[in-house]
Curated annotation (Swiss-Prot):
<keyword id="KW-0175">Coiled coil</keyword>
<dbReference type="GO" id="GO:0071439">
    <property type="term" value="C:clathrin complex"/>
</dbReference>
<dbReference type="GO" id="GO:0015630">
    <property type="term" value="C:microtubule cytoskeleton"/>
</dbReference>
<comment type="function">
    <text>Adapter protein that links SCN10A to clathrin. Regulates SCN10A channel activity, possibly by promoting channel internalization.</text>
</comment>
<dbReference type="GO" id="GO:0030276">
    <property type="term" value="F:clathrin binding"/>
</dbReference>
<feature type="modified residue" description="Phosphoserine">
    <location>
        <position position="681"/>
    </location>
</feature>
<dbReference type="GO" id="GO:0017080">
    <property type="term" value="F:sodium channel regulator activity"/>
</dbReference>
<dbReference type="GO" id="GO:0097539">
    <property type="term" value="C:ciliary transition fiber"/>
</dbReference>
<dbReference type="InterPro" id="IPR038911">
    <property type="entry name" value="SCLT1"/>
</dbReference>
<dbReference type="GO" id="GO:0005813">
    <property type="term" value="C:centrosome"/>
</dbReference>
<dbReference type="GO" id="GO:0005829">
    <property type="term" value="C:cytosol"/>
</dbReference>
<dbReference type="GO" id="GO:0045162">
    <property type="term" value="P:clustering of voltage-gated sodium channels"/>
</dbReference>
<feature type="coiled-coil region">
    <location>
        <begin position="69"/>
        <end position="673"/>
    </location>
</feature>
<comment type="subunit">
    <text>Interacts with SCN10A and clathrin. Identified in a complex containing SCN10A, clathrin and SCLT1.</text>
</comment>
<feature type="modified residue" description="N-acetylalanine">
    <location>
        <position position="2"/>
    </location>
</feature>
<protein>
    <recommendedName>
        <fullName>Sodium channel and clathrin linker 1</fullName>
    </recommendedName>
</protein>
<dbReference type="GO" id="GO:0036064">
    <property type="term" value="C:ciliary basal body"/>
</dbReference>
Length: 688
């Protein structure tokens, strides 16, 4: 019995120590949670504390049930021990009373019994009965000593049990007081756990919403990356098209330079033909002067013919020769006049053709320059517009992303503040529950804490509303971005149509160029016939050509500088676009790293929770094994109690048998005393 009670006490002490240790661990975790929250690291420990408290509630209920059962068993055993103690006291009192009565009766009988020889055989019979009675008394005394020894052992055990009971009662009272405190604390913890469960559910909902928003933002970012890739491809295509257009413009400029060179050569040839015509005109004028001189000489000769008829005959031959020469000169003059007229006609035709060609060339130059300028202006404007729009969109998206990040950071800060305030409220509530509930200031503090809690819940609701607004805003941004992307696609299609139209115009220009080349070939054929005449004028024209080449080289340098500036501007724009793309890629990589960090932290939390679940399962298994051991020990204690009850019943039976024997012995003693009294009375009568 004592060993069982010691075992129960040790088991109870172990359970109390485990419970206190677990409670201290929970409080230490709670304090570490508060410190971590103050330092900004209180998410995992807070969830672990909530999980521990949620897991602690059924253990505490089972522990309370087990304590109630043990208290009931202790009360039952105490009742049985009290009853047994009363029965033993009654038995001891009756034994002492019977022993004293027997002792008194025997002493009285022995004193009253005379030692004479007159009795004879009766005395011998009485001696035999006395011997029997003495043997019975010895046996009764032995049983009495055994019963006294048992009574002493039982009394010692009862004293020890009484002491243990008192100690256990003190410990039980302390434990009851502690259990009441623990129940109050558990009730408070249960309320706090309920509140924390609600807050955790809300936090889980918010975390799920945040994860949804993060996934949606990641999807949006991937879509934007795809769109950026498409935009890069389109920009590359546009750059390739611009390069093609620049190549086409360079080809057109080269063709224009060739045409200008052809025009310059045609001008030189025309100038040479003009000079040749001037020379022919000067020769014709000289011939005319000669004709005038010859006419004057003829007049003089005619005047002299009258005077020199004699000499006419002599000079007829000379006159005939002169007439022949005159005829030849007239023929030559006529031929020269015809040549002059043909040259004038050719000159006029050439001038007309040159004017037409110059007009056509000027028109072509104007059209080509307009076309090139329009194309360059359009491409520049479209590239600038697309660049500006892309920059505006990128800046707007970056600003919106930064604003959303700031809002998320602010919301996270507000959530952390709410958690800190809630934990401060919980600390104050714990302090208030520890200090008691008697003062009005505590009630005021409770009301203030309740108001703070309501304010925190309102702020939480406001944060949820802001999150919904942010999600709606993100959806609006997605719709706006999709609309802008569709608009940019339409603009790109328009640009492609414009490029196709410009290609068609370039085809028309190439056809016109072919026509002009054919006309230039014809002009070359015509100028080849005039080259023979213009060989003399080429020497003079070389100087002018060199000057014109110098001028054209200067113009070419200017055009090259302009082209370089255009290329530099295009390169700068490409560098800027690459820089923007690099920044976007960096931002995307940063988002990827952040999402990876979040996923890793979530996985770490999940692993921690799994490890804690496994640890708690092991702890529950250990507690269940301990409970099974305790139940087994309780069953063993019940068996021992039953054995002790059987032993007590045996002792009661022995006591009842001893009482019966004492009663029979007292009856026999009373019979013997009666017989002795009768014998004494008879002896007295005989003496009388």
């Amino acid at each position: 019995m004592a060993a069982e009670i010691d075992f129960l006490r040790e088991q109870n002490r172990r359970l109390n120590e485990d419970f206190r240790r677990y409670q201290m661990e929970s409080f230490s975790k709670y304090s570490s949670v508060q410190k971590a929250v103050c330092q900004g690291e209180g998410d995992d420990t807070f969830e672990n504390l909530v999980f521990d408290q949620s897991f602690l509630a059924p253990l505490v209920t089972e522990y309370d049930k087990h304590l109630g059962e043990l208290n009931g068993q202790l009360k039952y055993y105490q009742k049985q021990v009290g009853e047994m103690k009363l029965q033993l006291e009654n038995v001891i009192k009756e034994n002492e009373r019977l022993h004293s009565e027997l002792k008194d009766a025997v002493e009285k009988k022995l004193e009253a019994f005379p030692l004479g020889t007159e009795v004879g055989t009766d005395i011998y019979a009485d001696d035999e009965t006395v011997r029997n009675l003495q043997e019975q008394l010895q046996l009764a005394n032995q049983e009495k000593t055994q019963a006294v020894e048992l009574w002493q052992t039982v009394s010692q055990e009862l004293d020890r049990l009484h002491k243990l009971y008192q100690e256990h009662m003190t410990e039980a009272q302390i434990h009851v007081f502690e259990s009441q405190k623990q129940k109050d604390q558990l009730f408070d913890f249960q309320q706090l756990t309920k509140q924390l469960h609600v807050t955790n559910e809300n936090m889980e909902v918010t975390n799920q919403q945040f994860l949804k928003t993060v996934t949606e933002q990641s999807v949006i970012i991937e879509q934007l990356r795809k769109k950026l890739r498409q935009a890069k491809l389109e920009l590359r295509v546009a750059v390739a098209k611009v390069e093609e257009l620049t190549n086409v413009t360079e080809d057109l400029q080269g063709q224009m330079k060739k045409k200008e060179k052809d025009v310059v050569s045609a001008h030189g040839r025309e100038e040479a033909s003009d000079r040749r015509l001037q020379q022919l005109q000067s020769s014709i004028k000289q011939l005319e002067i000669r004709l005038c001189v010859t006419i004057q000489e003829a007049n003089q000769l005619r005047t002299e013919n009258t005077h020199l008829e004699k000499q006419t005959r002599e000079l007829q031959a000379k006159c005939n020769e002169l007439e022949n020469e005159r005829y030849e000169a007239i023929v030559r003059a006529r031929n020269s006049m015809q040549l002059l007229e043909e040259a004038n006609l050719q000159k006029s035709q050439a001038l007309l053709e040159e004017k037409q060609k110059e007009e056509d060339i000027e028109k072509m130059k104007e059209t080509v320059s307009r076309f090139v300028q329009d194309a360059t202006i359009r491409t520049k404007k479209e590239v600038a517009n697309t660049k500006k729009q892309c920059n505006i969109q990128i800046s707007r998206l970056t600003e919106e992303l930064s604003a959303l990040q700031m809002e998320c950071a602010e919301k996270q800060g507000q959530i952390e503040r709410v958690i800190k305030e809630k934990k401060a409220v919980e600390e104050e509530l714990e302090k208030i529950y520890r200090e008691g509930r008697g003062n009005e200031s505590d009630y005021r503090k409770l009301e203030e804490m309740h108001q703070r809690f309501l304010v925190s819940e309102r702020s939480k609701d406001d944060l949820q509303l802001r999150l919904t607004r942010a999600e709606n805003r993100i959806k609006q941004l997605e719709t706006d971005s999709s609309e802008e992307i569709s608009r940019y696609q339409e603009m790109i299609q328009k640009l492609q149509n414009v490029l196709e139209s410009e290609r068609e115009n370039c085809g028309l220009v190439s056809e016109q160029r072919l026509k002009l080349q054919q006309e230039n070939k014809q002009l070359r054929k015509e100028t080849e016939s005039l080259r023979k005449i213009a060989l003399e004028a080429q020497k003079k024209a070389k100087v002018k050509i060199s000057t014109m080449e110098h001028e054209f080289s200067i113009k070419e340098r200017g055009f090259e500088v302009q082209l370089r500036e255009m290329e530099d501007s295009n390169r700068n724009s490409i560098v800027e676009l690459r820089h923007l793309l690099a920044t976007q890629q960096k931002a995307a990589n940063r988002w990827k790293e952040e999402t990876k960090k979040l996923t890793e932290s979530a996985e770490i939390r999940i692993n921690n929770l799994k490890s804690e679940l496994s640890r708690q399962k092991l702890h529950t298994q250990e507690l269940l094994s301990q409970l099974e051991m305790a139940n087994e020990k309780v069953a063993e204690n019940e068996k021992l109690i039953l054995e002790h009850q059987e032993k007590a019943n045996r002792l009661q039976r022995r006591l009842s048998q001893a009482e019966e024997r004492a009663a029979s012995a007292s009856q026999q003693l009373s019979v013997i005393t009666v017989q002795r009294r009768k014998a004494a009375s008879l002896m007295n009568l005989e003496n009388i």
